[in-house]
Each structure stands twice: as C-alpha cells, then as structure tokens.
Amino acid sequence: MNTEEINCWGDSITEGYGSDGLTYPDVLEELTGIPVRNLGVGGEDSVDILKRSAAYGSQEEDILVIQMGDNGGWINLGQLIRQYRKLISKAGTDRYIIISSTDDPNDFEQIWGYTTEPVGLENTWYEEEFEKEFGEHLFNGRKYLIEHGLQINGLRRTETDYMRAKSGCISLQLRNPWIDNTHLNEAGYTALAHGVYEKGKELGYW
C-alpha cells in the first residue's frame, strides 16, 4: 500500500515543547523519507485530539503515530483505550503506532505518577495494559529512552542516570528539567523519533 504521509497526533510532546525547535516528527521525516505531519497541539486532552482527528477525515493511506492522555480527558484507562480505538477506526487505517507516556512513574505532579517504588525497566501498570490491548503496535517510549536515549545522542551515562534508570525514570539529559519534568529536549525528541522509526520498521511500515 502506498503511504501519503505519517500523521503524528498528540499534545505538547508531539508539538515539541521544551526543545529549541526540533520535534520528533521532524526527525522521523528525516529517518523515513516520508512526509510527516505534526498534529500535536499543546494542552489538548485526549477528547480534543480525538475530535481533531475525526474532523481531519479519512487517513486510510496514512500511518498514524499517536500519543495522548497526558492532559486528561479520561476517567479510567479503559476509557482512554477506547478513545485510541475510536481515533484509529475513524481514520480508516490499520497502520498505527501508539506511544505510551514518557512521564516518570514517580512524578506525582503528572497524571501517570503512581509509585515511589523503583520500577526500572519493568512495565508500569498502564504500560502493561496498553501492551495487552495494542500488542506489537505499542512503542514503550519511557523504556526506550532509558535504554537507548543517551547512546543515540552520543551522551555519557552518569551515576545520576543509573540511579534514575533503576527508579524507572528517564535521564535528565533528555529533558528540560528547568521547564518541567515531563517534556523532552532536542536529544529526547531525537531519541523518541529513532524509537518510533525502529517500531515502524518492525511493523513493515517503511
């Protein structure tokens, strides 16, 4: 099947907030050679993103990359999963990648924060549920950034990075901690794009 473009749906993470202008859709376009449309809008919740995608019309010849839910719009995870399913169904494509949250599981200021216990590279409860639902279509952004994010950018892992990894947290070298503890910087978005690219290759999308 021919691919017209890759549509990246999401909020400020997709939009690229926290970087100096480089976004993960930018890097993904370079890696794939396929036109990528950045459809991230900062501050939007999952309901807003679902509505925008539905209004966009048919995307049957496109590949979807979706990350939503960090700003709410859902009461329980089952509802968020149904919203993902509805977005995909209305788009009319079976070619999609779901990015699970890149928030740290111990960050209680964010919607996904839930434990102070060290998670490491084990799945969080919500990553496990997403994996059950979406299977091979799920890209675990948090785990990928912990394992590969620094190496992709030629950055050296520090003792602090090791400690954060044991806790299940992404290196601060991939974030802009003076802004907040949820958004990424250019290095973080670059690594995220590489992970999406690898997942797309695995699925045979490019």
Regions found by a protein language model. Give the residues of each.
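Serine-esterase "nucleophile elbow" of acetyl-processing enzymes
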Residues: 1-42, 47, 51-60
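Alpha-helical cap/lid subdomain in secreted, periplasmic
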Residues: 31, 50-206
